[in-house]
Amino acid sequence: MDVPAFRERLLRLAPKDPLVLAVSGGGDSVALALLVKEAGRQAVVAHLDHGLRPESPLDQAFVRALAERLGFPFFTERVEVARIAQARGENLEAVAREVRYAFLHRVAREVGARAILTAHTLDDQAETVLLQLLQGTARATGIREREGIVVRPLLAHTREELRAYLRARGEAWREDPTNQDPALDRNFLRLFVFPLLEERFPAAKRALARFAEARAEEEGVLERQAEARLLPDPRFFVPAFRAAPLLEAPLAVRRRALRRLLEKLGLRPEARLVLLLEEALRGRPQTLPGGVLARRKGGTLFLLPPRPRLPLPPGFRRPAPGDYLERPSGRKRLVDFLAEKGVPRELKPLWPVRAEGNRVVEVLGLYPPPPEEAHMAEALAEAASAFREGEVPVGAVLVLPGRVLRAHNRVEGLRDPTAHAEMLLLREAGPEARGGRLYVTLEPCLMCHHALAQAGVEVVYGAENLKEGALTRFGLPTRARGGVRERECAKLLRDFFARLREGCRSG
């Protein structure tokens, strides 16, 4: 065991003391504690008794004695993990892991530690990768060397290397008898599968560990791209995301984004669940574990819990039969109005309204139209002007303190390929644009996206730009919000290009 190399690796991963050492008493964690001591670092030892085995008090006593011998403060706690798992109806191993890491983080906060060290080895890495592949978790990135403040400095070392290090020092360790139980998947791989693999492929574990390292590097890049594609639709009171940025993403990026969605729901990112979300994106509703309904309505993907909880502010009630709105264009049934606004049928009976009898005077967040809809209406009027002038019908308004600027595309009229509505507004506003909010009928292209970001302008758009959108087409991260008056914005564009095609045929 190369202690100087370990010291250097530890300094890179966790440069500041004190460190929290997760020590169970097994060979790997005992070796970790001894190596940290040899490296000259300051640490505390944390030991959690899961209350799962009658021998656990002996493990605790062993670790306490080790900590005292090394001069490290000792922290311990006992938790009845089985009882918690049974009460929740959850997997025992998953609950044990959750409870264990919660304990370690509490200790870290108490002592002011910036790193928690665990004793995962190269063997653990290989087992995890193979287990992930066999269980269909669709990632197979294995165990990361660093996650938040959790650091795993022994991933390059095998279990046998650490045992040899302990034997050379005459050190003892505890053996957990449950590690010999083949009913547990990880134990089955360790006891039966890997011995067979290594007979034929002696370097199997190192190969799997290298695979995990490469996958983790690739995943980091793709993960950032996937996260950018998850554009929340904040108009609704349930998890909802714009569909087009997901649908237009490359397959590998889209599936990673969908796995992130599953994780946000507290579900395992299994391949079969990713495929269900793909189906939902394409308009075929799917039910996920826990009764969550994934369905697309219009340009939004909804993740509807089995019992959605919508707020009910004072003075509001739930919709009732016969409810209607009195609008300048005439009377409209409430159910039709909600459908027009993209509200899925599961939420219609729950949407908060304020009414006088059956005449609805307010629909929470939707009527009277919020300011963003009024500004988008102005942008639509500008887009209509562009339509009449033979320009691609994109309009925009820039809302600044004390004034509102308006523009529409004038590429043809000015013979200027940069004369997009957004660019014209930025030129007019100059330095005053910073901190403003732009409402535009079509998602900005790359040019406008970069200019708006540089100018510090917030963006709200109507329809996604499938051909040139900075996010939808090219996957650039954005803090924009989309979907405001989407139908009207998209219809204007469809009508324009239909007229253009008709003119081409007539010509």
UniProtKB/Swiss-Prot annotation:
Zn(2+) binds at residues 420, 445, 448. Keywords: ATP-binding, Cytoplasm, Ligase, Metal-binding, Nucleotide-binding, tRNA processing, Zinc. It catalyses: cytidine(34) in tRNA(Ile2) + L-lysine + ATP = lysidine(34) in tRNA(Ile2) + AMP + diphosphate + H(+). It comes from the Bacteria. SUPFAM superfamilies: Adenine nucleotide alpha hydrolases-like, Cytidine deaminase-like, MesJ substrate recognition domain-like. InterPro entries: APOBEC/CMP_deaminase_Zn-bd, CMP_dCMP_dom, Cytidine_deaminase-like, Rossmann-like_a/b/a_fold, TilS/TtcA_N, tRNA_Ile_lys_synt, tRNA_Ile_lys_synt_N. Pfam families: ATP_bind_3 (PF01171), dCMP_cyt_deam_1 (PF00383). Residues 370-500 form the CMP/dCMP-type deaminase domain. One of its GO terms (molecular function) is hydrolase activity. It is an enzyme of class 6 (ligase). The keyword Nucleotide-binding applies. Its main location: cytoplasm. GO terms for biological process: tRNA modification. It is found in: Cytoplasm. Its EC number is 6.3.4.19. The keyword Acyltransferase does not apply. ATP binds at residues 24-29. The N-terminal region contains the highly conserved SGGXDS motif, predicted to be a P-loop motif involved in ATP binding. Ligates lysine onto the cytidine present at position 34 of the AUA codon-specific tRNA(Ile) that contains the anticodon CAU, in an ATP-dependent manner. Cytidine is converted to lysidine, thus changing the amino acid specificity of the tRNA from methionine to isoleucine. Belongs to the tRNA(Ile)-lysidine synthase family. This is tRNA(Ile)-lysidine synthase. It comes from Thermus thermophilus (strain ATCC 27634 / DSM 579 / HB8).
